[in-house]
Amino acid sequence: MQNELDAYFEYLRSARQLSGHSLDAYRRDLDKVLTYCERERIAGWRDLQGRHLRHLIAEQHRQGQSSRSLARLLSSVRGLYRYLNQEGLCEHDPATGLSAPKGERRLPRLLDTDRAMQLLDGGVEDDFIARRDQAMLELFYSSGLRLSELVGLNLDQLDLAAGLVRVLGKGNKVRELPVGSKAREALQAWLPLRTLAGPADGAVFIGQQGRRLGARAVQLRVRQAGVRELGQHLHPHMLRHSFASHLLESSQDLRSVQELLGHADIGTTQIYTHLDFQHLAKVYDHAHPRAKRKQDTDT
């Protein structure tokens, strides 16, 4: 079974060109299935049945795995069996008809508008690291980039004159995003300093040795900016969530927000309508004269 898994991972890496992060997620999920098969003495992928997966999902759920994680595990199994069927190694999919237990959907954490402005409007020193970090923060918030999209960004994807950035998102889909004036200013201040570092390639964001910044380095810089400016931990996806929520709050155009985020399914984007409702509810509670009725003291 391990041999088939290794061949599948190589297929994902070479033919599907999945990122290392996505490959790691597939590997974690399918390693759980393989461990279960070894424990239950299931000899091969042909022998794995729906009842086995139901047992594994129930077991993982009891151990505290979230519904989202279990849904991803089932998706990983379906992907594996599509490959096995294409290769003539199997003729069934044990995940057919199975779904993860429904759980309470967690709303993403984000910054409100005032906190976002506080983060971005702090003074910026005129040095390599400060200018680079400011440009990253502004671009995350201006254009709603994923971490992988920012890390992989090259100069030929930027058109600052037109105020556009072209990013390669999930599924190798290219989308064109606007770059706001503040982000353009931050990038224009950063790019001359980038050139002085002798960049090794066309990466927009590099370290002082000229090499492209990795995902962990970007996460660290964003976290440090959050602690310094806001006194809280901050991660890149919070800026993407903030971009989406603030844009939806102002425009009420869910379909456009979906396109900007690169979501294949509008259901994924609809989570931000719940966040917008939370904001409206807070405004209502604070401002409406009959939102909070005083307890009647008459007897």
Swiss-Prot record:
CDD domains: INT_XerDC_C. The active site is at R146, K170, H237, R240, H263, Y272 (o-(3'-phospho-dna)-tyrosine intermediate). PROSITE patterns: CB, TYR_RECOMBINASE. Keywords: Cell cycle, Cell division, Chromosome partition, Cytoplasm, DNA integration, DNA recombination, DNA-binding. Residues 1-85 form the Core-binding (CB) domain. GO terms for molecular function: DNA binding; tyrosine-based site-specific recombinase activity. The keyword Cell cycle applies. Its main location: cytoplasm. One of its GO terms (biological process) is chromosome segregation. GO terms for cellular component: cytoplasm. SUPFAM superfamilies: DNA breaking-rejoining enzymes, lambda integrase-like, N-terminal domain. The keyword DNA-binding applies. HAMAP family: Recomb_XerC_XerD (MF_01808). Forms a cyclic heterotetrameric complex composed of two molecules of XerC and two molecules of XerD. Belongs to the 'phage' integrase family. XerC subfamily. Site-specific tyrosine recombinase, which acts by catalyzing the cutting and rejoining of the recombining DNA molecules. The XerC-XerD complex is essential to convert dimers of the bacterial chromosome into monomers to permit their segregation at cell division. It also contributes to the segregational stability of plasmids. This is Tyrosine recombinase XerC. The gene is xerC.
